[in-house]
Amino acid sequence: MDKLLIRGGRQLRGEVLISGAKNAALPELCAALLTDQPVTLHNVPRLQDVSTMLKLVRNMGVAAERDDNGTVRLDAGDLSIPEAPYELVKTMRASVLALGPLLARFGHAKVSLPGGCAIGSRPVDQHIKGLQAMGAEIVVEHGYMIASLPAGRTRLKGARILTDMVTVTGTENFLMAAALAEGETLLENAAQEPEIVDLAEMLIRMGARIEGHGTSHIRIQGVEKLHGCEHAVVADRIEAGTFLCAVAATGGDVFLRHARADHMDAVIDKLRDAGCTVAAQEGGVRISSSAPACEHLKAQSFSTTEYPGFPTDMQAQFMALNVIARGASMVTETIFENRFMHVNEMVRLGATIHVEGKVAMVEGVQQLSGATVMATDLRASASLVIAGLVADGETLVDRIYHLDRGYDRMEAKLRGLGADIERISGAAA
């Protein structure tokens, strides 16, 4: 099992290329299932979850090729197995995104209940509820969601879908299913994330009729057939936010190419309040910060919430900054359960954190000290890398397969900015 060895204390300087967003690439790979014509996606990140999704669609009979420049070409014309087996999706939550497209195009689908990060309950009941509103018959048996259309029907039917909570993957599933449904679908309480907007723009390129994406009310007029398209995946705002927090923590000056400041308002506002200089520039975002953080940065309290609020996927990384900033802060997690699993590992590095329910109280310290820590989920692993970059001595981050699920060669990008970081292969570790 690979590990990362980090020798802390170096500032980060230079330019880093922000990859395409994992949370846009995964649904967009599934959107290719909606058509029998070729689809080309550019700026697809090299991530474990993307590899798993490509393995999954190939297993269905989709021709899928990926080159070294981030381009993926898919052709689902010969798709013959509308199923997502457990063996292929047990490590990935996004497998549920295959349900809507398969059901919409073929009238039946069998998708395993998803795996992925162990960060609390992420129920699929909202997906099932929404697709049932569109006429689907769905049962859950032996760990699988088995969906079909009623006898005599060949298409889903448009419907008003109001979910009990804002759900990103649910909104994506309904968007894809409604694109081929008969009649109009209205999504109320829809997620507004940039990745939702990017998926909708791809579907529109394929011939879908969608209005209101980027708001809480999305209207879709179903069409009988979608065609192929060429589309570039939007830049990953969470990867960009992670690098912003890393530079804030270590000090330095970095230009994040392709980063979109307008997709990170909540995070950038907090970084500016902390004392960093963050500016949108042509082609990206620049951040500069002074070290040490305990003298130059002020800790910031925040609560996670749905976009455009502070993203839950940035909670752990910003906490790593608060740990070494001046003063006390309160971090409130409102989206997922069990998303403070990085806290115990940060405490091993010398952090002062106390958790009560959904709130973590952080008291900034002057210095962290390197230690061996264990990643527990994707964003927790990124927070431990940030902490390791500022810790005195060596930090060894174990179980970084979590990191590889969501970050495109993170250690190589950090090394390019001056960090002393290396991957130790499982065989050598």
Curated annotation (Swiss-Prot):
The modification 2-(S-cysteinyl)pyruvic acid O-phosphothioketal is found at residue 117. The keyword Transferase applies. Pfam families: EPSP_synthase. It comes from Variovorax paradoxus (strain S110). The active site is at 117 (proton donor). InterPro entries: Enolpyruvate_Tfrase_dom, Enolpyruvate_Tfrase_sf, MurA_subfamily, RNA3'P_cycl/enolpyr_Trfase_a/b, UDP_GlcNAc_COvinyl_MurA. CDD domains: UdpNAET. Pathway: Cell wall biogenesis; peptidoglycan biosynthesis. It is found in: Cytoplasm. Phosphoenolpyruvate binds at residues 22-23. Its EC number is 2.5.1.7. This is UDP-N-acetylglucosamine 1-carboxyvinyltransferase.
